[in-house]
Amino acid sequence: MLLRIANVFSREETARIRVALEQAAWQDGRVTAGYQSAKAKHNLQLAEDDPLAREIAEAMLQRLWQHPQFMSAALPSKVFPPLFNCYTAGGEFGYHIDNAVRQVRNSAERVRTDLSATLFFSDPDEYDGGDLVIQDTYGTQRVKFAAGDMVLYPSTSLHKVEPVTRGARLASFFWIQSLVREDAQRTLLYEMDQAIQQLTADVPDHPSLVQLTGTYHNLLRRWVEV
């Protein structure tokens, strides 16, 4: 399931973050890539211990843990601390699949990468190229969302970032370990949860809502890993 999570940050918040990122100390992005991925990666990145990166990452996680759509779709167990990248002057990242497990810096904690996420801080009209191209079961998907919006997709997906030929593409990227590791199961649970929420708004007293909600939780209980 590929999903757009809209308005994680408002336009005003995104503009302030973008100004701060434009003045940040960027470094070679290959430092966080695996052996194979490093061959295809040509971008800039903030150091994981950069104070600005940590500040924005903390704000992102606070916002996401309160975002109903994200919580419903991702069913997060662990979230790898968000990283930040910049593509400019021909920067690109060729086709690759994200590493299955990520080690949190200066920690024994490991995160299984069930879901990948990119939160955009540049609007599409601010740069040319830079499309996130994702190959999934429905074919090739091209993603270039508004600043403040986020894309969520399975980490098993082959994907790339096309060369940026004008301007700069600023974004955050990170990974989620879900309580439910299989994408098909997460998708079914998400669709059922969305239907329950809509029915609750439309016919809040319908007796079938209790049964449907019970079925959701019984499926979650069957598939969840805690």
From Swiss-Prot:
Spans through the membrane: none
Cofactor binding remark: Binds 1 Fe(2+) ion per subunit.
InterPro entries, per database record: Oxoglu/Fe-dep_dioxygenase_dom, PKHD_C, PKHD_hydroxylase, Pro_4_hyd_alph, Pro_4_hyd_alph_FE2OG_OXY
One of the Pfam families matching this protein, by short name: 2OG-FeII_Oxy_3
Cofactor: Fe(2+); L-ascorbate
Annotated GO MF terms: 2-oxoglutarate-dependent dioxygenase activity; iron ion binding; L-ascorbic acid binding
Protein name: PKHD-type hydroxylase PST_0995
Annotated binding of 2-oxoglutarate, by residue: 169
Fe2OG dioxygenase domain: residues covered: 78-178
UniProt xrefs under NCBIfam families: PRK05467.1-3, PRK05467.1-4
E.C. no: 1.14.11.-
Entry binding sites for Fe cation: 96, 98, 159
GO biological process terms, semicolon-separated: DNA damage response; intracellular iron ion homeostasis
Keyword entries, A-Z: Dioxygenase, Iron, Metal-binding, Oxidoreductase, Vitamin C
Range of residues in the leader sequence: none
